[in-house]
Every structure is written in structure tokens, then in C-alpha cells.
């Protein structure tokens, strides 16, 4: 018996299903690649037309799925497959070739010779044969098309790498921020461009438009305030040498009006400054007699007749002692910052003194009166003036109680 007869006899002794399956596999995907240590059999290599038939007829390109083997053949291949040889696994042996991926490539790459694409890739090199170093090199290398331009993915990768801050740039940012924090601050501006008030050959007049008439004694605490009634309102007029009124100077920001309290001296009949009053607290035996904001700034508004005027309003003045008092007002001109030292203060332009008014105890206070038309006019223009529309007098309240009592007695 010859060697060829032995080969035929050995092939005929194999199970029929295995032989038919091998023939089907050879017809579809070609012969099995040689294992390690086996000699390559050139007689089993199919012709060129077999690859063409594999590319065009058998493989389902849209699905890209390997053909399903019968369970008996799959078990046989798993037993014959040695462990650790990933290149001979059933999944990798049925992967479509590189020719099928060229069909999904862009149009400018489909015209390229397939044989040239296959020649660039070594025979038998599968996806599992890539080492981590080769994969990293493949990802880092910029991909280019036929015209030599980089792909969009490689451009995004390069932009991401270039946008990452380097240690040197971070250090420069820290130095710059440190310089900004430790840089000397700019000197305060010398406000020389502000409109300065000039007193050359001008006449200043303070007109008391609203005289306080009465008030209620307030407590020693800072929250117990009883404002004067009515509120003190003064008007400023500045007259030029030619007799015209200087409205721009009246609205100057360096003009302020200061108020102080004066009390009648029963011995001399005059008035002296009333500054302090004795308290019951040993820690603070003295306190200020006049409570509230004692300095007011100018407010340019419309008068009752519609003309422009400059007003000073004191809204929260209260007094901590009973008696007869007067309010003394002084108009001060403050110099702009940087012109004179702060300790120099300002100089007095004109003064005004109110009529005497009375501060009552809580039992004797007759009650608050209704706000004047001037106070309502200023409040409508945005100036903070408290307005009272009702008359709350203690005497009227007592009269109403007496009248109601008489009516009840008459009904009886």
C-alpha cells in the first residue's frame, strides 16, 4: 500500500460529519493555517479566485458576523485548540479580512489597490498580536489621508495635549498673582475736579421755613426718640454781587448745615449751649441732650410755587430734658480733600436761630400735629420727610371721652 493510499484510508476512517465540516470550512474560509511546528502545505492554498469568492459571495458585509459552526464542530475545535494561542481561536479565525474593511472606507481610499493594502500588513498578523506599545504608538501617530492632511481625531488629540498647562506656565501664573497681591496700592485721588465753593463777594442767607413749636421728652435710651413738631426745615439762598441768585452754588456738595441746642438761662434771660444731661447710670453719668442726626446736607427741590430751592431737613431731632429751648444752625463750607488738613475743619458762612419752643413731659404733651404743605411737597419729591395726615391731640381725645360720658348719663 502506498503513502497516498494510507492518507486516503486515514481520511476515510474519520467520522463523516467531521470530514464534511472540514470540506465546508475549506470551501468558505480556506485551509486551516499551519500550527506551530507544522510544515506549511502549499498544495492546500486556494487560488486567487477563492479569495475573490470569499470577498464577494460568501461574507455578509453589512452584518460582519462570522458563520455559525455546528455544535459538534465547535466542540472539536475547542479540544484541538491549545491554550494561550489566541491567534488560532475560533473567533479570530473567522474574522473577515482587511479587504472587507476597505469597502467601508471613504471613497478616496476605495480606489486604492487592495493588494497594496495587504502588502503593508504582514501575513498572519491578527488584532490580538498587537502589543500595548504598538497600540500606543498607533494612537499617538497622526493619521493622514491621501492628500497628506491629518484626520479630525488626531487634530483633537493634538489640541488636547497642547492645551494642557505645563509646569512652567503654572509657575508663571503663581508669580504673576503674587506680584498683583503685593503691588503697592494706588494713592487716593486728589478730587481737584470737583466744583469748589467760593465765598468771594457772595451773601449767604438761611431762612427758617418751618419752626419747631413743641416736643415730647424722650428717654435716655437711643431707641426712644420723639421728633420735634413740626420738623425743622431751612432754605439756603446765595446772592451774587449783582443781586442774582447762584443756584449752582446752592447745590454744592461741600456745604453742610450743623445744629446745636441752646437752653434759656433763667437768671440772665439769655441762651447757653445745652450739651450734656445727667443720667441715672453710674457707668455713663452724662449723655448728650440733643439726640439724632445733627448734620444735614443740601437737597435741591421744587418749592410750593414751582421754583427751584435748596432745603435742609432735620427729621429725627429729640431732646432729653423739659424746658424752653432753641436750635442754633451754622452753615459750614468744607474744603475738598487734599486741600487742607482734616483737623482744620470748615469755616462758618452764616448762622440762624429758631424761636423758643417747649419740651413737655409725656403726661403734659398735647400731641403731634398734621404735617405742613411744605413737608408734603418735599416728601412727594423723594426727600425723606415723615408725613402725618391725621391730627392726634390729647385734648381732643379727652373731650371726646367727656362727651361720650355725658351722652351715657343722659340716656340713663
UniProtKB/Swiss-Prot annotation:
Disulfide links within the chain: none
Homology family: Belongs to the velvet family. VelC subfamily.
Function: Velvet-domain-containing protein not required for disease or sexual development on seedlings.
Biased composition range(s): Polar residues: 73-93, 149-170
Cellular component GO terms, alphabetical: nucleus
Gene Ontology annotations of biological process type: sporulation resulting in formation of a cellular spore; trehalose biosynthetic process
Compartments reported by the entry: Nucleus
PANTHER family to which the protein is assigned, alphabetical: SPORE DEVELOPMENT REGULATOR VOSA (PTHR33572), VELVET COMPLEX SUBUNIT B (PTHR33572:SF3)
Annotated region described as Disordered, given as residue ranges: 1-197
Record-annotated Velvet domain positions: 195-388
Classification via PROSITE patterns: VELVET (PS51821)
Biased composition (Basic and acidic residues): 171-181
Name of the protein in its database record: Sexual development regulator umv3
Keywords of this entry: Nucleus, Transcription, Transcription regulation
Amino acid at each position: 500500500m502506498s503513502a497516498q493510499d494510507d492518507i486516503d484510508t486515514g481520511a476515510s476512517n474519520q467520522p463523516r460529519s467531521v470530514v464534511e465540516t472540514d470540506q465546508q470550512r475549506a470551501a468558505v474560509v480556506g485551509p486551516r493555517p499551519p500550527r506551530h511546528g507544522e510544515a506549511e502545505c502549499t498544495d492546500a492554498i486556494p487560488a486567487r479566485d477563492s479569495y475573490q469568492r470569499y470577498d464577494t459571495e460568501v461574507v455578509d458585509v453589512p452584518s460582519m458576523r462570522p458563520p455559525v459552526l455546528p455544535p459538534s464542530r465547535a466542540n472539536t475545535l475547542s479540544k484541538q485548540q491549545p491554550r494561550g494561542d489566541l491567534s488560532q481561536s475560533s473567533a479570530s479565525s473567522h474574522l473577515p479580512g482587511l479587504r472587507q474593511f476597505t469597502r467601508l472606507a471613504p471613497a478616496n481610499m476605495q480606489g486604492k489597490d487592495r493588494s497594496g493594502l495587504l502588502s503593508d500588513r504582514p501575513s498572519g498578523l491578527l488584532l490580538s498580536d498587537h502589543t500595548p506599545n504598538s497600540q500606543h504608538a498607533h494612537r499617538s501617530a497622526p493619521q493622514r489621508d491621501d492628500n497628506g492632511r491629518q484626520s479630525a481625531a488626531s487634530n483633537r488629540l493634538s489640541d488636547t495635549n497642547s492645551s494642557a498647562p505645563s509646569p512652567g506656565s503654572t509657575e508663571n501664573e503663581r508669580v504673576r498673582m503674587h506680584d498683583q497681591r503685593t503691588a503697592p496700592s494706588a494713592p487716593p485721588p486728589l478730587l481737584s475736579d470737583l466744583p469748589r465753593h467760593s465765598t468771594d463777594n457772595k451773601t449767604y442767607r438761611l431762612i427758617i421755613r418751618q419752626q419747631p413749636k413743641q416736643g415730647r421728652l424722650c428717654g435716655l435710651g437711643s431707641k426712644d426718640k420723639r421728633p420735634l413738631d413740626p420738623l425743622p426745615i431751612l432754605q439756603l439762598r446765595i446772592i451774587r454781587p449783582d443781586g442774582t441768585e447762584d443756584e449752582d452754588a446752592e447745590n454744592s456738595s461741600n456745604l453742610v448745615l450743623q445744629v446745636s441746642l441752646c437752653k434759656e438761662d433763667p437768671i440772665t434771660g439769655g441762651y447757653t449751649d445745652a450739651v450734656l444731661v445727667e443720667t441715672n447710670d453710674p457707668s455713663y453719668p452724662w449723655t448728650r441732650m440733643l439726640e439724632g442726626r445733627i448734620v444735614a446736607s443740601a437737597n435741591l427741590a421744587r418749592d410750593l410755587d414751582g421754583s427751584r430751592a435748596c432745603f435742609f431737613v432735620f427729621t429725627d431731632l429729640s431732646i432729653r430734658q423739659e424746658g424752653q429751648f432753641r436750635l442754633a444752625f451754622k452753615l459750614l463750607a468744607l474744603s475738598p480733600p487734599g486741600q487742607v488738613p482734616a483737623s482744620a475743619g470748615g469755616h462758618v458762612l452764616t448762622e440762624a436761630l429758631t424761636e423758643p419752643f417747649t419740651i413737655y413731659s409725656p403726661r403734659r404733651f398735647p400731641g403731634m400735629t398734621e404735617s405742613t404743605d411744605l413737608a408734603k411737597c418735599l416728601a412727594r419729591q423723594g426727600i425723606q420727610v415723615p408725613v402725618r395726615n391725621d391730627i392726634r391731640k390729647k385734648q381732643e381725645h379727652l373731650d371726646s371721652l367727656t362727651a361720650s360720658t355725658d351722652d351715657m348719663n343722659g340716656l340713663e
